[in-house]
UniProtKB/Swiss-Prot annotation:
Every HMA domain range: 167-235
UniProt KW Metal-binding keyword: yes
Binding-site residues for a metal cation, renumbered to this chain: 180, 183
Coiled-coil region(s): none
Predominant subcellular localization, coarse grouping: cytoplasm
Organism of derivation: Arabidopsis thaliana (Mouse-ear cress)
Function, in words: Heavy metal-associated protein involved in salt tolerance.
This protein's encoding gene: NAKR3
Subcellular location as annotated: Cytoplasm
Family annotation (InterPro entries): HMA_dom, HMA_dom_sf, NAKR1-3, NAKR2/3
Pfam families found in the cross-reference section: HMA
Identification of the protein by name: Protein SODIUM POTASSIUM ROOT DEFECTIVE 3
Length: 247
């Protein structure tokens, strides 16, 4: 038995077939995520306007890009941001100008000309001192240096007078050998280093050493005793104490 397909050409049958097709198409659209996207839906839902909640993407669009129809909040946010940035820039510029003014006040010190009344009335104490202070300092230094120079004069004169009038002649007997040149060199070396000695003479034959200068006999004896045995040629006269005229 052969199976056959029968088609009905009536209007009722075609209506039912179209309805079934639309029903299946609606069911597919309802479950399709691409078609369900809010950006593709141009018609508002059938629910009331109070209960309608816009999708997240639409909310982001509203806040980011202000539209012409009733987006006052987004415009206010942008204006607030702009106003905040403007006030911040004004504050920064004001602080910079204030810092410049204060720096200029600190660095730039007012200078008074020498001929002004402030300069003459004592605004600058160092300038008031002027040349008078320098003159007084110079005079004080000259006065202080004058007695020093005057005092050095008598000291030098005393040295000259003592060197000329108080020279003593000391004669010693030194154990010198006639053929020993080393002994003679040692004696000459010690006498030349001795302070106050102006001249000396060595006689090998008589073993006599004569020393002249601002010295004492004991100093010469102590100096030559370091080299050779020495003694006074003639014993020095004993020092006689002077009598006090008041007694």
């Amino acid at each position: 038995m052969k199976a056959g397909m029968f088609y009905c050409a009536s209007q009722a049958s075609t209506a039912t077939a179209n309805g079934e097709r639309t029903v299946t198409a609606r069911a597919i659209d309802r479950h399709n995520p691409i078609i369900k996207d809010g950006r593709r839906s141009f018609t508002a839902p059938c629910s009331s306007g109070d209960d309608y909640v816009a999708p997240y993407r639409q909310l982001s669009k509203i806040t980011r890009v202000p539209s012409s129809s009733g987006d006052g909040k987004s415009v206010q946010v942008d204006k607030g941001r702009r106003s905040n940035s403007g006030s911040l820039m004004k504050l920064i510029s004001y602080d910079v100008s204030l810092a410049r003014k204060s720096f200029g006040c600190v660095v730039a010190t007012p200078k008074t000309p020498p001929g002004s009344t402030r300069y003459l009335l004592g605004s600058d104490p160092v300038s008031l001192a002027g040349s008078t202070g320098q003159d007084t300092v110079a005079t004080e230094e000259s006065e202080a240096s004058a007695p020093k120079r005057g005092s050095s004069g008598p000291v030098e004169e005393k040295k000259k007078s003592s060197g000329s009038g108080s020279d003593q002649v000391v004669v010693l007997r030194v154990s010198l050998h006639c053929h020993c040149r080393g002994c003679q060199g040692k004696v000459k070396k010690h006498l030349s280093k001795m302070q106050g000695v102006t001249s000396f003479n060595i006689d090998f034959a008589s073993k006599k050493v004569t020393v002249t200068g601002d010295i004492t006999p004991l100093e010469v004896l102590g100096c030559l005793s370091k080299v050779k045995n020495a003694q006074f040629w003639t014993p020095p006269p004993p020092s006689i104490p002077r009598a006090n005229p008041e007694t």
